[in-house]
Structures are given as structure tokens and as C-alpha cells.
């Protein structure tokens, strides 16, 4: 099985650091998350284990419709489509990127990505990756998230085991929402990373690797 690691916004595949497997740069795969999933499914030979953080989790879920997914991990990621309010927020984010640039985007998003007491080196590394992104590609990513399809039915119908993980202080996915998503799946479970924000794979890489290994050992 090929392990496919799908990155969060506004980063790229480097956020996964030393992890093994395939880690594509999503923005360059096309204009929509479904196109991303189709491209990945076409390029990966054989069964897939998909590990997606935030935006990458949206892609992991769409892979259920296009590829042979044997297990998947969603980190800080939800299954429903954007509400009108979230779509409006995406539009504002696109305008921010286009008018003020990537650094302004980072300054706006940083408080939601990491808790105040997050390790400064971790935050600095994340910032460095974010600031190297192409503004047009980031805008494409935001539009893809805005227009993504609801994946609830895919999660509910698949036989593939799913781990729904989140940081304790993640503002984008509550504990109740994570539990509900895992409960909707036929074989779902949850894990909460204590003290973390939206990106536990960056804040707690050793714990993340251990949790991932334990989950996959049980698949």
C-alpha cells in the first residue's frame, strides 16, 4: 500500500518532514479538490492509505470516490461542504492574498493555526514554508476548499477504517464534531492531541507518528 500524505493550507508537502510515502503539492494538481483526488488516484499504483491534514483531509475524503483507499486519517478536517458564511470567509481570504500577499495571510491565520504557547521553532518553520508559497496557487487552494463537495456520504459508506484526529485547541474542528464524524463512519475512531492547535503533526511529530503507526497496525 502507498501512504499518501496530503498537506494543509497554506503549506506544501514539506510540512510532513521526514515522513515516508508520497506527498504531492496539491495546488498544482488542478482547480478543484476532486481533480486533485483524481490525479492522485491515477498516479498511485495500487491501494492507498491517505493521511490528510485540514485541506489535505478534504482531498483524502474525495479519494474515496476515485481510488482504492484502504484506510484514511483526517487531521483537523471535516466532511461537510462550506456553509454560505464559510464561503464568504474564503472569498475574503482570496482577496487578502491577492491584495496584501502571503505574509498578510500568515499574520491573519497564525493565531488559528497554533496556540499562543506553541514552540517558537515549530511556528517559525511553518511560517517559512507558508511564505514561500505562490500567491496564485494559494488562491487556487482557497477556491478549491470553498467549492468542495460534501463528503459525508463517502465517509459513511466506506468500509475503510478512519481516524479523525484533532488538536485540543483546534478552532476549526470541535471535539463534538470529530466524534460525530468518526461515529458516522462504519469503522471510525478519534484521537485528541493535548495542548495542540490545528496542526498536531507539526507540534507533536513523535506523538503523531506513534498514533499513526498504532492506527495503521490495527488496519
Locations of regions flagged by a protein language model:
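Conserved alpha/beta-hydrolase catalytic His-Asp/Glu region
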Residues: 82-85, 100-157
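Conserved alpha/beta-hydrolase "acid-adjacent" motif
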Residues: 171-177
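Gly/Ala-rich beta-loop-alpha elbow adjacent to hydrolase catalytic centers
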Residues: 52, 56, 60
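Conserved HGGG/HGGXW glycine-rich cap/lid loop of the alpha/beta-hydrolase fold
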Residues: 1-34, 38-39
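Catalytic histidine-centered segment of alpha/beta-hydrolase-like enzymes
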Residues: 196-209
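Flexible "cap/lid" loop of the alpha/beta hydrolase fold
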Residues: 61, 65-107
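Catalytic histidine neighborhood in serine/cysteine hydrolases
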Residues: 183-198
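Short beta-strand/loop motif that positions the catalytic acidic residue
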Residues: 158, 164-166, 170
